[in-house]
Amino acid sequence: MLAWRQLNDLEETVTYDVIIRDGLWFDGTGNAPLTRTLGIRDGVVATVAAGALDETGCPEVVDAAGKWVVPGFIDVHTHYDAEVLLDPGLRESVRHGVTTVLLGNCSLSTVYANSEDAADLFSRVEAVPREFVLGALRDNQTWSTPAEYIEAIDALPLGPNVSSLLGHSDLRTAVLGLDRATDDTVRPTEAELAKMAKLLDEALEAGMLGMSGMDAAIDKLDGDRFRSRALPSTFATWRERRKLISVLRHRGRILQSAPDVDNPVSALLFFLASSRIFNRRKGVRMSMLVSADAKSMPLAVHVFGLGTRVLNKLLGSQVRFQHLPVPFELYSDGIDLPVFEEFGAGTAALHLRDQLQRNELLADRSYRRSFRREFDRIKLGPSLWHRDFHDAVIVECPDKSLIGKSFGAIADERGLHPLDAFLDVLVDNGERNVRWTTIVANHRPNQLNKLAAEPSVHMGFSDAGAHLRNMAFYNFGLRLLKRARDADRAGQPFLSIERAVYRLTGELAEWFGIGAGTLRQGDRADFAVIDPTHLDESVDGYHEEAVPYYGGLRRMVNRNDATVVATGVGGTVVFRGGQFGGQFRDGYGQNVKSGRYLRAGELGAALSRSA
């Protein structure tokens, strides 16, 4: 319903589209919260009142007494690039108060590459079934330029707002072809480098926020043509990267990337490329992966934040590392987990899609000897996985006697090397029939709290929309608020609630250049109403949900519908939790459009009024 004004005698009555009554209001800037009533009209916060507002004629009133009213959360690290074409509502994020998502991370976007190349780039890396990624792109890819891509995304019945980065692998593939882009002997010509720079500039001109890259060669291609090759961006030289970063510098845009974990100098090169001192006093903001308290590197957390701050100060750099503010808990069906790509033997097994062929390989003695040698080799530098099979517990298995046991405990019982016990269990029960779990990082609450308050990090790395059977961090914002609230109650605060809200909203908007993240008068009305009494164990629970557009695949999700009372996008309440039990508005993601594509440099208020 559009707002309207009615004259009754000589008295004017202002009618709102939505009123959020008597909530504890956080504006997203870090200011202390106040109890206020918000009146929303034409997609904008029209009034922030200390007293009551006239509710006459208002079609939607949210009773927020005792609740927190916050700007909608921003998720800067998602892989919804294909899913947004199949479910523009992106329900798994929006139901947790997320109102803005960023696509095109980790060098992966679907802007320039054709549908088959894009599916090969995306599917194995992000563990989304290739057939559905390819189908989504073939059925919907009507664009050939960034401007057309943005128009196509913006034309969808979007639930949340969407912004995006251009992926370096996408860009490299479009210019070189996927074969040459993943060939270590190929170096782009001057003309090809110039074309990459031109195409990147066109994407930035169209409104994309920046570029994403990936230096770590752990991620592999899907498909049959170039299966198991590393991503194209990992083959780029620093000469190529510097040329593209210079385009970002000229435009004042951002780079998201990940250093090469096997080359410690790689991280330093990003600081130098970001530096104002070495680049004519014009730096480049960078968002890097990843700041975590990894079990494989227990001492790193004590120096990581300090080192980043020192380098930023000395070099005049603008580098922050993304941090997922929750325990990094992973699940795996057999070896279908990215950590196994660290091993050549793991990649060899993941190369095989046929279950029988994979089982035969896992049972082969020579293969096992090779795998053991790699597994036992001391790895210098960062590692994704702690490699401790005593810290890997079986949760599903045809042999019910093994459920609840770690692979290490089974190895002890059988007198085997832990890797052999692991492979034996997989072969005996059918590799993908054995589901197990481990926590690889962020397991120590005190260190996790320190990271959440560390100024050299920002909140991200949820990987929403990817690794469907491996992880579910869609509600990481709620989980951070729970920890901050619990610590405050215990008399050991590490982050005030208003600061936590800022870190999930306004701070991210400022760094990435997104027109979102605040909920002040005149701002676009993207909001979440949270019931703090339900920031409880439900936010940490394990759940699965069948995904119809992925052939009924059961993905890991989060379910805490009592926690989020309402989510609003662009002034429209699109989700009601609490007493409503988790309901989306009729037609949501189908014929009701609440979100839009947010171009770089556009302000939230201006967006609302022009929508």
Swiss-Prot record:
GO terms for molecular function: hydrolase activity, acting on carbon-nitrogen (but not peptide) bonds, in cyclic amides. Keywords: Hydrolase. GO terms for cellular component: cytosol. The keyword Ion transport does not apply. Gene3D superfamilies: Metal-dependent hydrolases. SUPFAM superfamilies: Composite domain of metallo-dependent hydrolases, Metallo-dependent hydrolases. The keyword Ribosomal protein does not apply. Belongs to the metallo-dependent hydrolases superfamily. N-acyl-D-amino-acid deacylase family. This is Uncharacterized protein Mb2937c. It comes from Mycobacterium bovis (strain ATCC BAA-935 / AF2122/97). The lineage of its organism: Bacteria, Bacillati, Actinomycetota, Actinomycetes, Mycobacteriales.
